[in-house]
């Protein structure tokens, strides 16, 4: 029974490492459970506030916890297999059977390929098993460590996307005001291709490395989740403008599709519905003051039609420690 338990634990851990590090379908069961648990502990300790600096350490701790869980699970699986047969490990000096602590020690240095040599496997079968375990340990631990590199690369792209959106504007109104040249929104559409490219890549990264959701920036003006909500609200305002306002509708539609796919994917991390505050109506006065021909009677029905979408956006904000006041800051003065 102990032998079978060890084999099953090894297979489960091996599948989890393989799925997490070598596929684009996200993390395994163990990885996702550890990531959610550690992230939830940090979120609770931070008081569910996105501004808390404590959350900036959650991503690193999640990665370390996942790596530690893989190593401990592999170690435990080999220990259970060896412990299932007393005498499977013996002292190289006295030839006496190893006790449980010594067997645990042997399992650890076998997986890590340290090869200390003070304890050895007894019998050809256990020697072959120890060699196979050493090869597996070397392979899986190397894969686990190298997994960190693409994850950090994906986090850098996430930060780049958040900074780019916020450089265009710190609120939906400010983004449009900064892009308006008195005749069209060429300032926005000149950056639309770059935004869409980064957003698509960020979505793919989220599918491949869901742990990047745990990496947090405590500055709302640099955090990617508020930035994406700002962009989504700004695109909705552009969609409600009169037809006579010149726009690149193809670029806008492609950006909207990219936003739709990303937000659908993020909704797999739901927030507590009771914690989601009602989304406020957008203040269109700054846009009118800047000379942007937006018609409130045309925009409000669009806003109401998107109520479910805005509720989902509010849930995403709450799940990351933000709310709508971080989206509708004071818009930039026209000029």
Where are these regions (language model features)?
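Membrane-interacting alpha-helical segments
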Residues: 15, 31-42, 101, 105, ...
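Cytosolic juxtamembrane amphipathic/interface segments immediately preceding
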Residues: 45-62, 118
């Amino acid at each position: 029974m102990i032998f079978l338990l060890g084999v099953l634990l090894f297979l489960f851990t091996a599948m989890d490492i393989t799925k997490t590090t070598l596929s684009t379908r996200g993390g395994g069961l163990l990885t996702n459970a550890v990531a959610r648990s550690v992230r939830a502990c940090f979120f609770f300790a931070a008081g569910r506030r996105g501004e808390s600096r404590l959350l900036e350490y959650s991503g690193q701790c999640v990665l370390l916890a996942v790596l530690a869980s893989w190593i401990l699970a592999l170690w435990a699986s080999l220990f259970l297999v060896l412990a299932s047969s007393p005498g499977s490990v013996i002292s190289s000096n006295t030839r006496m059977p190893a006790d449980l602590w010594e067997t645990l020690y042997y399992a650890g240095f076998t997986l890590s390929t340290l090869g200390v040599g003070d304890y050895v496997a007894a019998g050809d079968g256990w020697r072959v098993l120890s060699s196979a375990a050493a090869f597996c340990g070397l392979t899986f631990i190397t894969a686990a460590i190298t997994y960190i590199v693409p994850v950090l690369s994906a986090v850098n792209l996430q930060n780049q996307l958040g900074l780019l959106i916020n450089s265009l504007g710190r609120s939906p109104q400010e983004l449009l005001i900064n892009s308006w040249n008195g005749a069209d929104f060429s300032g926005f559409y000149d950056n639309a291709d770059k935004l869409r490219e980064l957003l698509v890549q960020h979505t793919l990264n989220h599918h491949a490395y869901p742990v990047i959701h745990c990496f947090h920036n405590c500055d709302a003006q640099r955090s990617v989740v508020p930035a994406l909500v700002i962009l989504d609200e700004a695109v909705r305002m552009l969609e409600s403008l009169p037809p006579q306002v010149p726009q690149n509708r193809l670029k806008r539609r492609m950006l909207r599709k990219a936003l739709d796919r990303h937000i659908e994917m993020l909704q797999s991390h739901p927030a507590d519905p009771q914690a989601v505050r009602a989304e406020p109506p957008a203040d269109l006065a700054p846009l009118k003051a800047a000379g942007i021909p937006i018609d409130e009677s045309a925009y409000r029905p669009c806003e109401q039609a998107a109520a479910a979408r805005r509720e989902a956006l509010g849930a995403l904000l709450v799940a990351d420690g933000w709310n709508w006041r971080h989206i509708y800051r004071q818009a930039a003065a026209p000029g």
